[in-house]
Amino acid sequence: DYPNTLSLSAHTHLQRNNFYGSEDGWRQQKPHHEYNAGTTSGDWYSGELDENGVPWSTMRDGTPKGYAFIRFTGNQYVIDYKAAGKPKEHQMEIYSPKVIPFGDRTSAGIFVNFFMGAKGDLVEYRIGGGDWKKMNYVEDVDPSYMALLYRWDTTDNLMPGRRPSNAVESTHLWRAGFPRDLKLGEHTIEIRATDMFGRQFVQTKTVKVQKPAEAE
């Protein structure tokens, strides 16, 4: 009777979009959307402190602390997630190595945590202005978050703040590998993510391609 539905949930201190169909017991043709919103306190105000003495508090799925806006137009809606302390354009976190070897294969990859993303969304990448290529959706821990977490385990002196929670698998993570034919020098990695509402977001990061230093 009501084909346009939306559920809102929270208090999990992570963020995800769930879609329920007939296999889940949902009896309508259009899948039911549940938006589980991230929190303003993030990971319970854990983590290192920023320049204002406020914990970074990235959530354990890699989503930054923040808040959401929902705009309704009739029976349609659009959700925007705003990372606290970041410009509204900051919709993803890109993880990649700073430098990769020239002319050789590497097991390193490019990871994109698209905060409002969900399985089935299109996330693409290109390097140095080449052709756009589709990234692979994965459900795994976010390496950006793991890098923050490992700082607490490898420091020689205890840092102010509190160690973040252990990571959980993110439901909005994508991965791609590096081609072997990149030239020496610095390259721009561009990421283009299209959300469930048809909007596109673009962010960039750089990577250097170098020859390994010769052993003395």
Residue ranges and their predicted role:
Residues 1-98:
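Conserved beta-sheet core of the metallophosphoesterase superfamily
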Residues 90-216:
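Long, low-complexity serine/threonine/glycine- and acidic-rich segments characteristic of extracellular
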